[in-house]
């Protein structure tokens, strides 16, 4: 009985679980590109290492090592991998760091000073980034693990006191190696929890698309990593800006991502597009009013000829009044995605009337229009764009079958009017697109769209339009390195 109850609760929870409207998969194919950009960023961060001055005394010799700066990172071997539980793991082995520092030596009344180059060799770094969902639904670096070690140090001392420095070099280089070991992991911890999070802050969560609607890209759960990819589930739901708490129930199928051949895949379900169209419908945007000169001249003449019998019965003051054509969508359009293509079904009312000045309008006809549009999706940069095309069009009377027959001559000119006057306006808006949840400075290239039953996927490669350093510097928060919590680092001496 207890087992039955547990099963029932599990099924009940599953029945109420909301599917994501948008999914993104980053595959291992992207890791080489990400690693190249990440290592450039890492080298720049390691150059910010601040090593305390090293002072000491050996016999009558007093030495001071100061102004230690990391000048370069030379890599022999590095790997970036997905790891379950850890998300991203970077391993650097047998690398070397170039350093430059100021030396000062005092022996009785003799003083020597200057700058010298050194190198830290056999540098190994193993650092992992743990990704999670924060309370606002944003992806964050929630933890950074780190192990770092420097095997040996070498400093090319020279000059009059070369033999003295050679005598002291063991003390100096051992001390520098110890201090350097202690500084690598704190720098990486700050880079992950502060700087990389400032990059992730550029990913839209709840943002405006235009003056009418917004979109919710909040993560529904923590990112899930396997050995070959990283999967993220986003709500992917539009909403009217005047009803920010409104939500369309998601009854669409869950999009599936199986491919791993491209760097990244994005999947959108029918719910993603349905919520967009319903949001615009609720915002009152799906209507069109043409009056007087706004009605195409040929269509004006055809409409007057079609309703000539009704017009001649009106008073002379009304007969030559401006014509009004009003299209109003009656219900939220719906999207259907099949392997053969994507279609959008629309039902609207069409009202034709005369609008004499300073008098009530005179309605000539009211009809219903059924239209089916084909939709082609494309991903450009980081914007999902849509191109619409009118495929099927039918009008019929709300009153009688006889009047529906009389409307047949209007079918072609009304369709032409929609294709020439309405579709360009729609496409101007839909081709502007909506941004997908991607950090600033990263774009998609070489996109391929594939339709499935109930959802579509877009495979693409990644392109860094801006470097990580450029984006992070633009969005860098106030430096909180001093207040950062103690790093979970392990530095091997």
Curated annotation (Swiss-Prot):
Reactions this protein catalyses: a 1,2-diacyl-sn-glycero-3-phosphocholine(in) = a 1,2-diacyl-sn-glycero-3-phosphocholine(out); a 1,2-diacyl-sn-glycero-3-phosphoethanolamine(in) = a 1,2-diacyl-sn-glycero-3-phosphoethanolamine(out); a 1,2-diacyl-sn-glycerol(in) = a 1,2-diacyl-sn-glycerol(out); a 1,2-diacyl-sn-glycero-3-phosphate(in) = a 1,2-diacyl-sn-glycero-3-phosphate(out)
List of glycosylated residues: 64, 94, 117, 143, 245, 398
Gene field: PLTP
Family annotation (Gene3D superfamilies): Bactericidal permeability-increasing protein, domain 1, Bactericidal permeability-increasing protein, domain 2
Organism in which the protein naturally occurs: Homo sapiens (Human)
Cited function: Mediates the transfer of phospholipids and free cholesterol from triglyceride-rich lipoproteins (low density lipoproteins or LDL and very low density lipoproteins or VLDL) into high-density lipoproteins (HDL) as well as the exchange of phospholipids between triglyceride-rich lipoproteins themselves. Facilitates the transfer of a spectrum of different lipid molecules, including diacylglycerol, phosphatidic acid, sphingomyelin, phosphatidylcholine, phosphatidylinositol, phosphatidylglycerol, cerebroside and phosphatidyl ethanolamine.
Effect of residue 96 to A: Significant reduction in phospholipid transfer activity. Increased secretion
Effect of residue 176 to E: Significant reduction in HDL-binding and absence of lipid transfer activity
One Pfam family recorded for the sequence: LBP_BPI_CETP
Protein name as annotated: Phospholipid transfer protein
S-S bridge residues: 146-185
